Amino acid sequence: MLIARSIADLRQALAPYRHPAFVPTMGNLHDGHIALMRLAKPLGDVTVASIFVNRLQFLPHEDFDSYPRTWEADCAQLQAVGCDLLFAPREADLYPQPQTFKLHPDPALADRLEGQFRPGFFVGVGTVVLKLFACVLGKTGGTAVFGKKDYQQLMVIRQMVQQLALPIEIVAGETCRAADGLALSSRNGFLSLAERQEAVALPLALQQLARRWREARNPGPALEQQALDALRARGWQPDYLTVCRRADLQPATAQDAPGTLVALGAARLATTRLIDNLEF
């Protein structure tokens, strides 16, 4: 596996190839990331991963410096899965000047759910992903693979690619889960043993919300409030548990048919904020 630190070295390494398959990450890799790498392998003539902890998507109260950096383990996992090229820029490489030019996604999509509770988050995500696309896929186009666990992020990136006419295919990987159903996440490492056992309550809450929504004659916000109250009673601090249309992430109504919906949730368990979703 070749490692490129600078944009110039990256572009030199990519010069022989016509269709890269790209998996951007912030490192601290787990089996979910590796599944995305496996999904990417047959989709291009070279498989590229990136590791970059993006300061722009951290809010002032979120500790950028405490995000886990596991460089040696990450490299070993990428090598084992057959990654051809790792782009691992230093901050000065990707942002040699203050990044004053930023991407502002459509507020109708980006300013609700995660965007409501983490204002400006998708500005940071959109800006770094667009810049990574320019570095890795800017010459030839190609394929980029993202996980469905970050559902709203996936939709923001898809909309960005569509509206900016980027020659990039976005492929979505299914959420990888532990045996008890908890979505794999870098944040799971912050959970204590007791918190890890309790954490499965979030996917269970989404399953119950989806089931009740399907069964109700007139589903709506009352069902979402019941789900919030039940999770809060277990000691969680939920931000949202809601049902949306998959097409645009706008609130679902009784007229929306099952098979077109997604239940999404975000909640804090002690000091760890977890997110998850369930299509139904």
From Swiss-Prot:
Detail which positions bind beta-alanine: Q57
Please share what else the UniProt entry notes about this protein.
The reaction proceeds by a bi uni uni bi ping pong mechanism.
Query: Which InterPro entries did the record assign?
Result: Pantoate_ligase (IPR003721), Pantoate_ligase_C (IPR042176), Rossmann-like_a/b/a_fold (IPR014729)
Q: Which pathway does the protein contribute to?
A: Cofactor biosynthesis; (R)-pantothenate biosynthesis; (R)-pantothenate from (R)-pantoate and beta-alanine: step 1/1
Entry keyword set:
ATP-binding, Cytoplasm, Ligase, Nucleotide-binding, Pantothenate biosynthesis
Q: SUPFAM superfamilies per the record? A: Nucleotidylyl transferase
Which amino acids does the record list as binding ATP?
26-33, 147-150, 184-187
Q: Where is the active site?
A: H33
List its EC numbers.
Answer: 6.3.2.1
Source organism lineage? Answer: Bacteria, Pseudomonadati, Pseudomonadota, Betaproteobacteria, Burkholderiales
The residues that the entry says bind (R)-pantoate are: Q57, Q153
Q: Which GO terms describe its molecular function?
A: ATP binding; pantoate-beta-alanine ligase activity
The answer, when asked if Ligase is one of the entry's keywords, is yes
Keyword NADP assigned = no
| Pfam families assigned | Pantoate_ligase
Tell me which family the UniProt entry assigns to this protein: Belongs to the pantothenate synthetase family.
- PANTHER family referenced in this protein's UniProt entry, alphabetically: CYTIDYLATE KINASE/PANTOATE-BETA-ALANINE LIGASE, PANTOATE--BETA-ALANINE LIGASE
The UniProt catalytic activity note for this protein reads: (R)-pantoate + beta-alanine + ATP = (R)-pantothenate + AMP + diphosphate + H(+)
- At the top level, the lineage of the source is Bacteria
Q: What does this protein do?
A: Catalyzes the condensation of pantoate with beta-alanine in an ATP-dependent reaction via a pantoyl-adenylate intermediate.
Q: Which GO terms describe its cellular component?
A: cytosol
**What does the record list as GO biological process?**
pantothenate biosynthetic process
- What protein is this chain from? Pantothenate synthetase
Gene from which the chain derives: panC
Describe its assembly. Answer: Homodimer.
Cell location = Cytoplasm
